[in-house]
């Protein structure tokens, strides 16, 4: 019996393990975590014939090498163990690539980008599903991709997929050497994850590899970096713009754009823009890319319009929570870098009280700070980044900030200040990762939502 190592006991790792076990492999999951909370899960998987090694760092013994190693998205591709595995020519892939091996008989839509990919994925899935297609979303949202593969291996009634809609991070691109979508979308590109990918050029090449393998490529022409590369790359691609037909980087027959408050796709009027309820130009960009994918998939414009009219957005992405004393509380916890946080501020009314901070990331904060100076009457700083953010704001001659450290204190203080200063919006848009205080950006956003709902 062939042996597979799974690195990481998260949702995707467990799904990959169950998938391989169903397909007749001997499966060993390795995870460096030692929490007692994992013991019941370890026992449950053992009962299914899957070995789980906790507090374990894998190594490659020449006498007992696996035939396959599957890596969870959070595991760096350049760890010594994985480098050695590839040097020994052991088949080493990510969980998404494993799913592709089982699901490639269905066409895929693959969505990648620094920001915007989650909302775009949700839009694509809503349109395809609204058109009565069996088109589940997976990757960073929806299912783990191998959960879909497992359903197919078990021949479940729901596993006859018309399309697979996959949100694909740079980590997943990096560990997926063969994944080849029918339709590939690239939403935005700015500096992010450089602590992992080292250089901007390397980060770009990792993203681009997915598009090169896609049969059809769709790009956001309003993204400055992608626009610039589009002048000399991607000659046959489909392009979008919110700035009208004259700003397309392709012939209008291959473009999707906004003209006179209508969405036009490949030369045909699709829907009036006022059907789409999400705020911000960035969400209009996401909309155009989703419509481009839908039209390439042959979906009728009536089905597209119906899906868009009922689409309410995605949790943690400019998610409206409630209004208290005329002040809107907005959850933008997914804004884990400066560019996303800048977009968050661009999308809400002013004056705004901003809650920011967390685990600091590298990046250019100038445009974000410019938006703070333009729209924000008070910044409440939380998490590890609070001191550095305070210093940076002070150095940029912005002094309306307070260090409050925790979300609980931020919510309590924000309502008091909002009433005093007549704010229109209290916005959580952290410009940081969440791992200093939370398990994930979702965990952070859920805590924000819970605290907001408790306000009297």
Swiss-Prot record:
One of its GO terms (molecular function) is ATP binding. Pathway: Cell wall biogenesis; peptidoglycan biosynthesis. Its EC number is 6.3.2.9. Belongs to the MurCDEF family. The keyword Cytoplasm applies. Gene3D superfamilies: Mur ligase, C-terminal domain (3.90.190.20), Mur-like, catalytic domain (3.40.1190.10), NAD(P)-binding Rossmann-like Domain (3.40.50.720). Cell wall formation. Catalyzes the addition of glutamate to the nucleotide precursor UDP-N-acetylmuramoyl-L-alanine (UMA). It comes from the Bacteria. This is UDP-N-acetylmuramoylalanine--D-glutamate ligase. It comes from Crocosphaera subtropica (strain ATCC 51142 / BH68).
